[in-house]
Amino acid sequence: MRTEDVDVAVIGGGPAGMAAAASARTAGAERVVLIERGDRLGGILNQCIHDGFGTKVFGEALTGPEYAQLYARRVRETDVSCLLDTAVLDVSSNRELTVCSEKGMRRIRAGAVVLCMGCRERPRGAIRIPGTRPAGVFTAGVVQDYMNLRNIMVGRRIVVLGSGDIGLIMARRLTLEGAKVLCVAEILPYTSGLARNVVQCLDDFGIPLHLSTTVVKIHGTERVTGVTLARIGPKGGGVRGGSTYLACDTLMLSVGLIPENELSKRAGVGLSPVTGGP
């Protein structure tokens, strides 16, 4: 297996990874490699077509793809070696990486390793919603990918569970595309997204927000036909009061993120029992 020595290896080509790689090169590291398993740099930015990115770095409001393109250009201008379509299979405690691409496997020995793998969305199984398992249950990021990158409309009558920022933004996006967002249900007594997104994405479009409320059952066989909502008592203390059935064809989940920490574990990095991250 071919072996390569570098000063800094950055795993993950999203915004954090690009910033880390460019900063390492600017700070004097001569051999910096940026490893990304996808076919382009930018990570989640590539599907975030709303603006508001780049105000601090570039001094103007950019869409996610614009921000990713400009930062990728900055990375390449600093002479960082970018390995796309390349997966990191293992990271040892002595900073030795095993990577794989269509060109085969190789080993990279690094003076320093920067972990920028990001996170993934919590799926339905992680929150244990009872009911059947029909089509029509999506995480907000998947809905964003389908609509913004693939031009696929996921449904017409949508209930959103969770008030994370991506969920709020996609509730607005779905409404703009002609769907009916029946409500956003949040199990906590407050929203988890930014206040400005609540105003701009829900209030401005007349989308109801139900706090201390969650989905307690999903209905449908082949496709979602509806969900049952129920109020939750203080501190999540069980269902309080009656339940409400809403007929819908889609349930969109925006219920938090899980760190991509498998490589961190392999490298022997200590992880928080609360967040699952370093």
Where are the predicted features?
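Residues forming the flavin
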Residues: M1-P278
